[in-house]
Swiss-Prot record:
Belongs to the universal ribosomal protein uS4 family. This is Small ribosomal subunit protein uS4. It comes from Prochlorococcus marinus subsp. pastoris (strain CCMP1986 / NIES-2087 / MED4). Residues 1-42 are annotated as: Disordered. Part of the 30S ribosomal subunit. Contacts protein S5. The interaction surface between S4 and S5 is involved in control of translational fidelity. The lineage of its organism: Bacteria, Bacillati, Cyanobacteriota, Cyanophyceae, Synechococcales. Keywords: Ribonucleoprotein, Ribosomal protein, RNA-binding, rRNA-binding. GO terms for biological process: ribosomal small subunit biogenesis; translation. InterPro entries: Ribosomal_uS4, Ribosomal_uS4_bac-type, Ribosomal_uS4_CS, Ribosomal_uS4_N, S4_RNA-bd, S4_RNA-bd_sf. GO terms for cellular component: small ribosomal subunit. One of the primary rRNA binding proteins, it binds directly to 16S rRNA where it nucleates assembly of the body of the 30S subunit.
């Protein structure tokens, strides 16, 4: 399953607020469809599927990518759910979003893909790069790159930069100083349900 490129508000009407996907809020409260979804008790599978979809759409990863992240999270010590969230939070496109370089994760991904972002002084156009402690993320030293970011950083998608990331706003630079704490994940998600969803699939 490839990355979603359709209407974003349609997704948030179905799944709720996804801060990484869009800053806009739908004026319609009912789920998408001619008459919305019928009111009936959802199965446990449907609930787990919805949580998985929240994670996919918020961070903008494909099903195949998410499966890889789940496998990697399982192989690490500690809680698989927390490990999974940290892997997604450490993606370069998400770190740029948390720094305020892009208004959304898709916007930040575009900055990375188009070569406007450097890691430790070198241009890196891989949005899924896993940022690690000590990495310095900067906007490339040219007018075009800086102009793209300056408007976003004054009105970031999320108000607060997580404490594990250090932002030097005038220099348009950030530094990773540690791991992301669970409480600083902006998405309202039950990651344990995502792990359960994949328990028989991965």
């Amino acid at each position: 399953m490839s990355r979603y490129r359709g209407p974003r508000l349609r997704v948030t009407r179905r799944l709720g607020e996804l801060p990484g996907l869009t800053r806009k809020a739908s004026k319609k409260s009912n789920p998408p469809g001619q008459h919305g979804q019928a009111r009936r008790k959802r199965s446990e599978y449907a609930i787990r599927l919805e949580e998985k979809q929240k994670l996919r759409f918020n961070y903008g990863v494909s099903e195949r990518q998410l499966v890889r992240y789940v496998k990697k999270a399982r192989a690490q010590e500690g809680s698989t759910g927390t490990n999974l969230l940290r892997l997604l939070e450490n993606r370069l496109d998400n770190v740029c979003f948390r720094l305020g370089f892009g208004g959304t994760i898709p916007g930040s991904r575009q900055l990375v893909n188009h070569g406007h972002v450097t890691i430790n002084g070198k241009v890196l156009d891989i949005a899924g790069y896993q940022c690690k402690p000590g990495d310095v993320i900067s906007i490339k030293e040219n007018k075009a790159s800086k102009k793209l970011v300056e408007g976003n950083i004054e009105f970031p998608g999320l108000a607060n930069v997580p404490p594990h990331i250090e932002l030097d706003k005038p220099k348009l630079t950030g530094k990773i100083n540690g791991k992301c704490d669970r409480e600083w994940v902006a998405l309202e998600i039950n990651e344990l349900l995502v792990v359960e969803y994949y328990s028989r699939k991965v």
